[in-house]
Amino acid sequence: MDFRSSFVDHSRVKRNEARIAAQAFGAAVRSTRVRLGITQETLAEQSQLARTYLSGVESGLRNPTVASVFRIASALHVRPSDLFLEAERTLYADNAEDDENP
């Protein structure tokens, strides 16, 4: 019996968690931006970040630095914690749906 097959690949789990968290944060940025009627181009100008970088953040493909989170939040006229709380709500809502539909 191969005991290695019974172990969880923790690096793979962590990568998956990071991807899901990045997607939730990106969705929070996007929904806030859209709610305010701001384009990615305007957000890029106001945050002094590249539009392609912001697109990557919103799609969950990029993990923003702490400095970038503060720039994005400032440009959206919200606190960084507001973006994280919205992302957290999304994550918990998704987990609750998964628990209800096994």
Model-inferred region functions:
Residues 29, 40, 51, 66-69:
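Helix-turn-helix DNA-binding elements, focusing on the entry/boundary residues of the two helices
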Residues 37-59:
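Short alpha-helical DNA-recognition segment
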Residues 45, 85-86:
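Phosphate-coordinating loops and pocket residues in cytosolic domains that bind phosphorylated ligands
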Residues 33, 44, 73:
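The alpha-helix within a helix-turn-helix
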Residues 67-82:
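DNA major-groove recognition helix of helix-turn-helix/homeodomain DNA-binding modules
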Residues 1-31, 35-36, 41, 90-102:
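N-terminal flexible/basic segments that precede or flank functional cores
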